[in-house]
């Protein structure tokens, strides 16, 4: 069984996203890079884009690579051919580990993945959301991850939004992730987030059956 530690590097052969999440740091970073004339952002900003010169990147055997942290590779708008090009390099680097992360995990079922891949989903809450994102609703993401037949799965609950403790824990347990990342918004967006006490209850409950990797844990903005 593979061991997956902390991310050691990122790889962005495809950039851009159309989910329009209100808290998206990557979209703001892309705009800043575009203003500095950094390619491909200077030409494309945050529009979905294949970056051909990044496709054949080589990786060390011990790396754990976060694929496409500047976009959603599995968004419905991404051509299948782009994804296959990315997976070709993943399959060539069997000794390197890769993390995919999406808000559209139902699309994972369209592709084959090796045991050097962790399939992740960002799921901020178990509840339906309004005015936060155009991504598939969190309950749909949870269902897709629970149905996914892959040995290594992960969940990212960041930025965490208010949730129903028992139901959320039920879904996380059903998904059987090898690790769960939990953290608050870092950019002052005043999201509908849970109290720190409630988040700690979630951390404790999930820690009983899988690894929890805590990021920013703080009082909710309305508790300060």
Give, region by region, the residue ranges found by the protein language model:
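N-terminal [4Fe-4S]-dependent radical SAM core
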Residues: 1-66, 72
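Small/flexible residues
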Residues: 4-5, 34, 39, 46, ...
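Conserved AdoMet/S-adenosylmethionine-binding subsite of the radical SAM
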Residues: 46-210
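C-terminal accessory extensions appended to soluble enzyme cores
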Residues: 210-224
